[in-house]
Amino acid sequence: GLALGTTADDAQGEPNGILEGIPAQTLVRKHIPGFTLDEMRAALADDSARYASCGITTAQGGPAFSPMDAELGHKVTELVLDCAHDGTLTIRTVLFIRANDMSRLAPYPNHVPGTDLSGNGRVTMGAAKLWADGDPRGHTGYFLEPYPFVDPAKGADYRGEFLYTVDELVEKILPIHKAGWQIAIHANGDGGIEIVTQAYERLQQLHPRPNARHLVIHCQYPSYSQLQRLKAAGAYPCFFISPLYHWGEIHAGYVGADRVARFCPCHDADELGLPYNLHTDAPITPVDPLIQVCTAVTRTSRKGTVYGPDQAVTAMSALRAVTIHAAFLNFEEHVKGSLTPGKYADMVLLAENPLTVAPEHIKDIAVLRTYVGGDVVYSRS
């Protein structure tokens, strides 16, 4: 597969200082001093408080708790578990582990998704995380058709970049699948999503595993047929919809307004009976689930442009995506996601009802209190 990382060149072929993708950025990152564990502990405390103030009771760690340095990744995981016991971590966290290969996963024998790693329900095991393509805003999201407006240096047929062919991806993730891990793969463009979809289909052909619940992370530009095939393979989309609100016009300029009309097609998923979640990919976009809910309902950017109104969903559908469906995708629907006897008393008190306010006002609703396990972890002064 292509190495998803280059140094950008100007018209004369000279480097212009832009580093595209993780491998290229690593050239600089390895010279930047890392954070100490004490600094990470302080950051966990700050972030936990910030998430709670937005009404979030469970956050996913993404690969943040498993950096490229495997040894450091394990130390950070131990720090998170320690913070779950000393009160530093006030909300619940699901750990996603960077899965460059099986050796990165070896330190995590309790890898069944949803496993309580901390013993108090604060930290649970999530998925093994990989990447298939880049980001459309950086012209690295991989599409089946060329970008309509792109740097001439990349050529008229440029479709973005991918990390693996289907065969390469299957070879990498089949052992992970056989070992019982949940797998989560970053894919934005319909080309990247196609590679991941074919790989998930192949996994189930080679080693059938009911209820694997593999994920496509971000899944910004899937076709209807790709969503159908994901459902048939027992896989699910995790829609990164907030860029439609923050940068809808930028996406339209990069990939075309017709494509953006199908950005994170929640209505299609609802029509197919395919559960999905909504996420912020923080710090890429601000931590605020109500912006995600509002965007799924209105399909409107902050500048007021509406993209793909036929993909709008009801407020109830969007709320399910950040509650019970999010819990389901984490294998935690038995303890989270709804106010049901026997589940954790994790809940949020809002100043207004998102089901009855004007749809465009949902994003402005204030969070009054956030509860985790029945305890108040945030209260608006």
Q: Where do the model's predicted regions map?
A:
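Basic/polar N-terminal segments that are highly enriched at the extreme N-terminus
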Residues: 380-381
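Non-cysteine beta-strand/loop elements that form the S-adenosyl-L-methionine
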Residues: 120-140, 235-244
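Divalent metal-binding segments
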Residues: 1-111, 126, 130, 135-192, ...
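Accessory "access/gating" subregions that flank catalytic or transport cores
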Residues: 115-119
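His/Asp/Glu-enriched, well-ordered alpha-helical/loop segment
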Residues: 42, 174-184, 191-214, 218-219, ...
